[in-house]
Amino acid sequence: KGYVFKIMGGCDKQGFPMKQGVLTPGRVRLLLYRGTPCFRGYGRRNGERRRKSVRGCIVSPDLSVLNLVIVKKGENDLPGLTDTEKPRMRGPREPQRSEALYFKEDDVRKYVNTTAEFTTKWKGSKAPKIQRLVTPLTLQRKRARIADKKKRIAKAKSEAAEYQKLLASRLKEQREKRSESLAKKRSRLSAASKPSIAA
């Protein structure tokens, strides 16, 4: 008594989902884009639409599942629903998502949701892996990565400078050889042309 629920969705007996904004108690076929409710559309092309059967959002007896959310709690507890407290396991796995909860210097691992101990063979606690956690080890790896990159850039620059120097010396040698050969050729031609002039 006193509970207020909000209808969030549901399915009829054939498994067709309810769609918000379709004000009919039956089924309709709508052209839906990928990613819209009632059409996940994996493997579709960009902008492709498909005609899918969806059920209207009006509640009727032909529904098999109705999803509700408690908006306002009533006087008494509902057995199995509001009288038991279930642990919240699905916390944020990325520290960036939960920066409002912690400071950057804090160790986020202390605040991670963990499961309760098992009463069967194995006793312990399970915790989700935190992605992109900034620890001293990750910072050390980042520094090492940056230092390695700088070292590689410096090595590449020095090798490029050496190569340019070698290339310049080779080009200079080629020019000298060519000028020598041209000088020899000219001297031969001039030597060959002198007797003919004298004659």
UniProtKB/Swiss-Prot annotation:
InterPro entries: Ribosomal_eS6, Ribosomal_eS6-like, Ribosomal_eS6_CS. The keyword Repressor does not apply. PANTHER family: 40S RIBOSOMAL PROTEIN S6 (PTHR11502). Residues 172-199 are annotated as: Disordered. Component of the 40S small ribosomal subunit. Plays an important role in controlling cell growth and proliferation through the selective translation of particular classes of mRNA. This is Small ribosomal subunit protein eS6. Belongs to the eukaryotic ribosomal protein eS6 family. Keywords: Phosphoprotein, Ribonucleoprotein, Ribosomal protein. Ribosomal protein S6 is the major substrate of protein kinases in eukaryote ribosomes. Residues 172-183 have a biased composition (Basic and acidic residues). GO terms for cellular component: ribonucleoprotein complex; ribosome. One of its GO terms (biological process) is translation. One of its GO terms (molecular function) is structural constituent of ribosome. It comes from Nicotiana tabacum. Pfam families: Ribosomal_S6e (PF01092).
